[in-house]
UniProtKB/Swiss-Prot annotation:
The family this protein is said to belong to: Belongs to the mitochondrial Rho GTPase family.
EC number: 3.6.5.-
Matches recorded under PROSITE patterns: EF_HAND_1 (PS00018), EF_HAND_2 (PS50222), MIRO (PS51423)
Residues annotated to bind Ca(2+) 2: D324, D326, D328, D335
Protein name (record): Probable mitochondrial Rho GTPase gemA
Species for this entry: Dictyostelium discoideum
Length: 658
């Protein structure tokens, strides 16, 4: 909204333009001898007005003055046309001269017009006779002029309606009718109707398609309107029902009823009530959400990541529950359409659900929904802030407290603590070793025997909820060369997958490993062995961890009975672990590493262990980034403990001698 507006007074000679201005600022009447008054500014503090107001007096006499008046008409925020109620010709001059002049000078840039009949103190029978024609002409103006036209009568001598004149000028600028309402057709504009429908959905907290008494009063309170009693609401409902039968149902006002109530406010005018409602929901003068609301400023320092805060997670959880129409714990396609109806569009491509936890029908679970928004926040928090606004979130800090700023892994290492709630893991491996299955198993997807190679230009990625308030991103990378710059800036952990039956697949990840070391990327590394069912000697697959991860589905559907020897399968019926000299030699010379087994035929604790690797690396900056034990930490602890014990022994002997 503007801090100040410019109002210009025009009209025939001797109608009292200057007298109106003088009486208003001096609060008394006096005869004015000069033809025009200098510009007057009325501060906002005066009478608690909406804003400061500049009032321009005009006089149509001579070429220079006329040019000056025309310039003021072009730039005025509101135009007051004054006529004298005791001279009907000055009123007719509005139709014949002043309205055409305004249309000529303003073109499509219309401004609100206030038609003012001055000298009301001189009203006589003749004026009353002309009043019907005046009212009909005013109605004609309103139907032909595409902006607000208001009409009132006043007296500069008795001060009658002078404050109303200023108020009408200000409200016509700040609450423009044409943006919301077509008076000629008695209907809302499309933009107004669209905005009010969105507000209706935001206030419909239980998403039942109607506004209850509680929800109506939530709307009233948020907009600064007076709350209503049950009796008042029932009276309005009865009135709405008498006009539109489907405007009210057993639960309250329907969307049609809500729109009809606002149409009545617009019909009565001015539009202040509806504008106040719209601005309370952060709409600007063009019925677009405020830029500062949709795109608030969040300063994210270098080497930091973003994720939803606890407040942000709670908001999206409540959003999920609101739009879960049948309370079955998932969002159907119908639910998603309803959810995003308050936004311009769904911000992701079709099929985005496959990257997150869903039910068997690909409907997002709550875990999947929260993972989706945490991943979005991690990759581009600005989109999250934008959609928080579309979903109606509004906090004291303009939604930026919905986002948490986290240290990068490098900063965690420096501070010797693990602070992040999200870990980004890159998964490398040769073709057909089971990378996609490794990702899909994490988010509970069913195993498929069909092999579909991942497109090298579209690396597959999933995100899931691993532990309390912890999220893991798994990004499948296809290619023999590591993306050094990307890994350096984004990667927290590298997973190297190989088929235990294929030396060639191990050579592939050994090459990746060597590149990581050559580039001196200080990133933890985990080796993962696939297609091996003999895990008896591997303590990493302890079934006691079955209950630790709600995202991991037990896909042990008699899969071991499927004697499909297709190499595209990520399991094998061979009970013996296929090893080779190349693989054995590597792990003998790299004792910090011990391969972990992955199998879809059992619940895996491997994803938890990957997170533990990250946590340990934050406390133990090992350049090898191994998934081995913290022997150095233990040794340090033992040395310190022995030292303390020795000091204690010497001290006790000393005291004994004393």
């Amino acid at each position: 909204m503007k801090n100040n507006i410019k109002v210009i007074l025009i009209g025939d000679e001797q109608v009292g333009k200057s007298t109106i201005i003088n009486s208003f600022i001096s609060e008394s009447f006096s005869e004015i001898t000069q033809k025009t008054l200098p510009e007057v500014t009325i501060p906002a503090e005066f009478n608690n007005e909406i804003c400061s107001t500049r009032i321009i007096d005009t006089f149509d006499d001579g070429k220079n003055l006329k040019n000056q008046m025309n310039m003021e008409i072009r730039t005025a925020d509101a135009i007051v046309i004054v006529y004298s109620v005791d001279r009907f010709d000055t009123f007719m001059s509005i139709r014949m001269k002043w309205i055409p002049l305004i249309n000529q000078l303003r073109g499509s840039n219309k401004s609100p017009i206030i038609i003012v009949g001055n000298k009301l103190d001189l009203v006589d029978d003749k004026h009353e006779n002309n009043k019907v024609q005046i009212e009909e002409t005013i109605q004609y103006f309103r139907s032909t002029y595409s902006n607000t036209i208001q009409w009132l009568e006043c007296s500069a001598k008795t001060m009658e309606n002078l404050p109303e004149l200023l108020y009408a000028s200000q409200t016509s600028v700040f609450f423009p009718e044409r943006i919301l309402y077509n008076r000629e057709e008695n209907k809302m504009t499309e933009g107004c109707e669209r905005a009010l429908k969105r507000i209706f959905k935001l206030c419909d907290h239980d998403n039942d398609g109607s506004l209850s008494e509680e929800e109506i009063n939530y709307f009233q309170t948020k907009c600064g309107h007076e709350t209503m009693t049950s009796e008042e609401i029932q009276n309005i409902q009865q009135f709405v029902l008498s006009k539109i039968p489907d405007g009210v149902n057993s639960n309250g006002f329907t969307e049609k009823g809500f729109l009809y109530m606002n149409l009545l406010f617009l019909l009565r005018g001015p539009c202040q009530h509806t504008w106040t409602s719209l601005r309370s929901f952060n709409y600007d003068d063009d019925l677009v959400l405020l830029e500062s609301y949709v795109h608030p400023t969040l300063q994210v320092p270098p080497n930091h990541n973003t994720i939803l805060s606890s407040m942000g997670n709670e908001f999206f959880k409540s959003l999920f529950e609101k739009y879960d129409s049948d309370s079955d714990g998932v969002l159907s396609s119908f639910d998603l359409v309803s959810l995003f109806s308050t936004t311009p569009k769904i911000p992701w491509e079709i099929g985005f659900e496959k990257h997150f936890n869903t039910d068997k029908d690909s409907n997002l679970t709550l875990s999947g929904f929260l993972s989706l928004w945490n991943l979005q926040t991690y990759e581009n928090y600005k989109v999250t802030l934008e959609y928080l606004a579309y979903f109606g979130s509004q906090t004291e800090n303009n939604n930026i407290d919905m986002i948490s700023i986290l240290n990068s892994r490098e900063l965690d290492i420096k501070s010797n603590q693990f602070t992040r709630n999200i870990v980004n893991c890159y998964v490398f491996g040769a073709e057909a070793v089971g990378k996609t299955t490794f990702l899909n198993t994490f988010i509970g997807k069913s195993f498929s025997t069909l092999y579909n190679a991942t497109n090298g230009n579209d690396n597959f990625k999933v995100c899931g909820h691993l532990l309390k308030n912890k999220y893991l991103i798994l990004s499948e990378y296809v290619g023999e060369k590591i993306p050094t710059a990307e890994l350096k800036s984004k990667c927290d952990l590298v997973c190297l997958l190989y088929d235990c039956n294929s030396e060639q697949s191990f050579k592939f990840i050994e090459n990746i490993y060597n590149q990581l070391k050559q580039q001196q990327l200080n990133i933890p590394i985990v080796f993962i062995r696939t297609k091996n069912n003999n895990n008896n000697n591997n303590n990493n697959n302890n079934n006691n961890n079955n209950n630790n991860n709600n995202n991991l589905n037990n896909n042990n559907n008699n899969i071991n009975n499927n004697n499909n020897n297709n190499n595209n399968n990520t399991t094998t019926t061979n009970a013996n672990v296929s090893t080779s000299k190349i693989i054995d030699s590597f792990f003998k010379s790299h004792k910090n590493y011990s391969p972990k087994d992955f199998s879809i035929s059992r619940s895996n604790s491997i994803y938890h262990e990957m997170m533990e690797t990250i946590v340990n690396s934050s406390f133990n900056d090992n350049s090898n980034g191994s998934n081995g034990s913290n022997n150095s930490n233990i040794l340090t602890y033992l040395v310190i403990a022995a030292g303390v014990a020795g000091v204690g022994l010497l001290l006790s002997k000393y005291l004994a001698k004393k």
